[in-house]
Amino acid sequence: MDTSNSWFDASKVQSLNFDLQTNSYYSNARGSDPSSYAIEGEYKTLATDDLGNILNLNYGETNEVIMNEINDLNLPLGPLSDEKSVKVSTFSELIGNDWQSMNFDLENNSREVTLNATSLLNENRLNQDSGMTVYQKTMSDKPHDEKKISMADNLLSTINKSEINKGFDRNLGELLLQQQQELREQLRAQQEANKKLELELKQTQYKQQQLQATLENSDGPQFLSPKRKISPASENVEDVYANSLSPMISPPMSNTSFTGSPSRRNNRQKYCLQRKNSSGTVGPLCFQELNEGFNDSLISPKKIRSNPNENLSSKTKFITPFTPKSRVSSATSNSANITPNNLRLDFKINVEDQESEYSEKPLGLGIELLGKPGPSPTKSVSLKSASVDIMPTIPGSVNNTPSVNKVSLSSSYIDQYTPRGKQLHFSSISENALGINAATPHLKPPSQQARHREGVFNDLDPNVLTKNTDNEGDDNEENEPESRFVISETPSPVLKSQSKYEGRSPQFGTHIKEINTYTTNSPSKITRKLTTLPRGSIDKYVKEMPDKTFECLFPGCTKTFKRRYNIRSHIQTHLEDRPYSCDHPGCDKAFVRNHDLIRHKKSHQEKAYACPCGKKFNREDALVVHRSRMICSGGKKYENVVIKRSPRKRGRPRKDGTSSVSSSPIKENINKDHNGQLMFKLEDQLRRERSYDGNGTGIMVSPMKTNQR
């Protein structure tokens, strides 16, 4: 056996001079780590320690043990669960197969390490076999402990390399996992940002759609707001209103009565104001031609009676100024009747001077033309309904009803419960009668040229103003006052002490003689009543029939009405809409109409009307009915009162739905009176019971007082 490559001889240990550079076996087998045995003194120490006694093993046994240890040193196929490693369980999306592919073939590396170690051992084994021929005797005496140490050192160096590679692979896997986690977080943040951007985009698109719809709806006539700054006024009349800086001009909102009851007229004509101001633009306060598209938004002007030979080009033109609430005096009285919130004044400007007595020059407020000398044109002023956004004040119910400063009219001139006869409308009221302050610019006293009264009613006293009753209306829906006050031919002899509850308005008390009337028919549209329901909730149940009647579309109800106001009040009862509530302590009643609330409030007052039998009443008409029944010691016959005995209560609708016009004795007698005899008797009785004081003021005397005298 050749022992030239052997580095250890047990028999010559004491005289060993070992050179590491000339030992081929040492350089081949331990070339990777020669520093382990670089010190000569270390080998001398090992020789003196008799290593043969420490590792008493032969070569075959050593090889078998080392191979078993190498097989047991297989590297794990996944990351170790130490403190610095990343837990794979935190990433549920990574399964075993994926980790095997990402672990950079650690299993193959471990196998390569095992093969390398085996090849080294085999090479060492061959070298030793070749050296046995030279040093066979020496090697036979040499123990196998030193060979064991050499192979163990080679194995340790290989294991250290594999551990280094394993640590590098583990650190690389942790780095990749951290990068994946960061990428996922960035992806989530980007998705959230995308969602926010999509939401903002949808909101922007919705706003654009709303703006587009607003622009499409605003393609119609545009009216200038009173607060808008306009160029200075010029000399034209249209420029006075179109370019005025004063907030007292506003576009026409409604030309209807404040009761919502349209008064009919025949031969409706179309009017359109196309005159331009000095700036070349059409004035904003012009009326559009009446057609189906403007019936709900624009109101045509009043019909003006003109000469037959007058051309269409010389017809009067209209603009509608508006008296602001801040310039209207608050003429609040104890009126028991609803009045208009504001006064809408329709000014009629004539193109040509009208000098004829019958050329339609009604009394009204004058407007001074700027820069033009001469007499001011004639105008006509009428009481119009308030704007839609302002609700009327309930007299005595200020605490629970929205209110504004407004001109109120005493119910002494309105609520007289007068039987219907031939009636005259007036639309000309003096400035002081309306209670308008003199601070309004460019206003003159009313003209004295149009104090003209028509018809055969010149002998009637104009001091009595009544509400316009409708004998064609249903009894269960009481009629409200019309937009124009009415002078009746036959004032009522019953409610002559109404002023006890409602004092005369100071504005009208001294100027009542200035009221003049003229006969006219006015187109009108309905206004929206005071309601607690959303806008349009009542009108959707109203159906206008071809015969100018109105049908209720509420489910299960097929009633028809001749007045729009009545059907609107009727629908409010269906919808439980009662905006007028009683403010008396402890009373929670509410009503659809204001006059029902007023009548109810009288029940909380002291009963001021007493019968000789001892029974008291809140209302004078109730006392008259009681005495006319002749059921007590205070019974009395009245010529103009006919009592129809009915088991049903007054003011309640009949169950069969039949007409109840006969529920009012006065209406019944008037309807039966074809020759006018009853009307004459009523008027004659009223004149006989009226006395005058020294100032000529008419005092209404109760029938009971007349009887006592």
From Swiss-Prot:
SUPFAM superfamilies: beta-beta-alpha zinc fingers. PANTHER family: METALLOTHIONEIN EXPRESSION ACTIVATOR-RELATED, ZINC FINGER PROTEIN ZIC AND GLI. Present with 688 molecules/cell in log phase SD medium. Residues 245-267, 443-483, 644-677 are annotated as: Disordered. GO terms for cellular component: cytoplasm; nucleus. InterPro entries: GLI_C2H2-zinc-finger, Znf_C2H2_sf, Znf_C2H2_type. Residues 471-480 have a biased composition (Acidic residues). A motif (Nuclear localization signal) lies at residues 635-659. It is found in: Nucleus; Cytoplasm. Changing S522A: Constitutive nuclear entry. Keywords: Activator, Cytoplasm, DNA-binding, Metal-binding, Nucleus, Phosphoprotein, Repeat, Transcription, Transcription regulation, Zinc, Zinc-finger. Determines the mother-cell-specific transcription of the HO endonuclease gene that is responsible for the initiation of mating-type switching in yeast. Recognizes a specific sequence in the promoter of the HO gene. Activates EGT2 transcription in a concentration-dependent manner. Synthesized during G2 and early mitosis. GO terms for molecular function: DNA-binding transcription factor activity, RNA polymerase II-specific; mediator complex binding; RNA polymerase II cis-regulatory region sequence-specific DNA binding; RNA polymerase II transcription regulatory region sequence-specific DNA binding; sequence-specific DNA binding; zinc ion binding. It holds the Pfam family zf-C2H2. GO terms for biological process: exit from mitosis; G1/S transition of mitotic cell cycle; positive regulation of mating type switching; positive regulation of transcription by RNA polymerase II; regulation of transcription by RNA polymerase II. Residues 647-659 bind DNA. This is Transcriptional factor SWI5. The keyword Acyltransferase does not apply. The modification Phosphoserine is found at S225, S278, S300, S376, S488, S492, S505, S522, S646, S664. The modification Phosphothreonine is found at T339. Cell cycle-dependent phosphorylation of three serine residues prevents SWI5 from entering the nucleus, and it accumulates in the cytoplasm. As a consequence of CDC28 kinase inactivation at the end of anaphase, the three serine residues are dephosphorylated and SWI5 enters the nucleus to activate transcription. It is then rapidly degraded. Threonine phosphorylation also seems to occur. Phosphorylated by PHO85. A zinc finger (C2H2-type) spans 550-574, 580-604, 609-632. Residues 245-264 have a biased composition (Polar residues).
